[in-house]
Amino acid sequence: MTKLTIHSPAGLHQVDVADGQTVREALDTTDWRVRAACGGIGSCGACVVQVKSGDVNPLTLPEYQRLDEAARAKGWRLSCQLRLNGDTQIHTTHLAKPSPWRSIPKADLMQHTLQCKDISQYVYGIAVDLGTTHLRVTLWNRRTGQRIASRKGVNPQDSYGADVLTRLDVALQHPEKARKLSEFARVAIIKALRDMLAREVGEIKSMLSEIGQVMIVGNTAMLTLLTNHGYADLLNPDFWQTQIHCQPVDYDEWHAQWLLPHAKITVLPPVAGFVGSDLTADLVATKLCNSSNAAMLIDVGTNTEIALWTGKKLLITSVPGGSALESVGIQNGMPPESGAIVHIKQSENGLIVETIDNDLALGFCGSGLLDAIAVLVATKVLKPSGRFAQSTGGAGFALIADNPHTMIIGRDIDAFQRAKAAIASAMETLLEFAQMSWDEIERLCVCGAFGRHLNIENAQALGLLPPISPEKIELNADASLAGCELALLCKDNVALFEKMTANAQTYNLSLIPSYEDRYINHLLLKPIKSGEFS
């Protein structure tokens, strides 16, 4: 990683740039996007920046074509052609208008080799992963198997509640708000698509008519709210072990709103109850069931979905994993964006606090909250019960003394304990049904945005992850999006998903007494015990 310092009318900013990444690609993942309209090939000339100092790559052919000699002499470059060989400072006045959309870093996206070579028209398609907190969308040329662009942003439905149950209740009690929730999600999807087309292709209207497929996955609650259909069944426990029907009632309305006249819109069906098609996408992307070895998958989020593959059969469940793991409802919680604390380490000289973009700490994202609690337990500031060893007078504990944004209070710790207890208890209960122990698990996939920056050692120390070798644990943050992309590129996409979970056994843990007993035990901030379950 090299450091890029940006001087602009909006202020001074620093960004980490990965090896091989262009300056534009790095800026597209932040709040400081430059203007662009050609997808990074250097033909539009809109993304100009001025290099003030640093070691950078030589001028490219597109730069000789788009920039005159005087501009080149003053250090002006096209950011889509500019790569860093060392720490660099640039100046720009060509920032794009503020946008809620960011590119997904390429390192976070899985690579695929599938192609739909027999497609002769309407070759473009989009994959949509609709989560409770975030929305992720990618644009593809299905015939060539090329991912053209990606976008992520906040799910605007959060204005009606941070968690799924609140939104479902709002929809059930207020039909007009249910329509609003559906509208919010649909508008967000098309806005993400239009942002990609404007910046990466330079053309919107004609490209919309060339899109032939829209593939959507998500947790069941989000799918019912998107389609405005099926959410009443989801709130009925009698349906928690059956598939919830949540397909759009009027596809013509969607086509008209999105201006996608030729697109086949597919909402991939959920498995059952609160287990959505995002879990199936995880299974497809990670190939969890492609081996005879026992494996487990956890998609951590506000609604956490868990799958256990015994080598022969698939067991599935879901639990309210707690919005605390996404820092929702935490006093100083925030999404994983600039200024969010992502890692905390204890050193001889005190705490090392790492934030996204190395900005001033503004709060905790999920992984930062976990690290903070782990450090407080390790230094005996916190007891395993979750209580502070010494009274804080209700004020909590600030990791950085003069920064109130690093304060953790008792309510934050309690929310984390409830979330991790629900997940740990669910994992053990599935093992009980399979008559297995942790020693038999050869692979554990942690999916969802929470896993992107997760410190595995700390997660095990607090009892969120099981006592297996860290080498067996994989972090697959964008697996559900990757699975959706594979479905987009596969002719038999719906059949692929249905086959994956056709013989799965789904469990409603609210009906299992042993789950409740385990939940109480797992509230303590200590490692999960190894062994068999009965």
Located regions from the model:
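Acidic, glycine/GT-rich loop-and beta-edge segments that sit at the periphery of enzyme/chaperone cores
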Residues: 4, 76, 95, 99, ...
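Immediate flanking context of iron-sulfur cluster ligation sites
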Residues: 19-45, 52-79
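Fe-S ferredoxin-like electron-transfer domains
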Residues: 57-127
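Conserved phosphate-binding catalytic cores of ATP/NTP-utilizing and phosphoryl-transfer enzymes
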Residues: 106-123, 265-295
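Glycine-rich phosphate-binding loop of actin/hexokinase-like ATP-binding domains
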Residues: 137, 145-163, 232-246, 281, ...
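N-terminal phosphate-binding loop and adjacent alpha-helix
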Residues: 157-199, 329, 340-345, 418, ...
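Phosphate/ATP-binding catalytic cores across multiple sugar-kinase/actin-like superfamilies
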Residues: 188-199, 279-282, 417-439
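Catalytic phosphate/nucleotide-handling subdomain of diverse soluble enzymes
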Residues: 310, 436-501
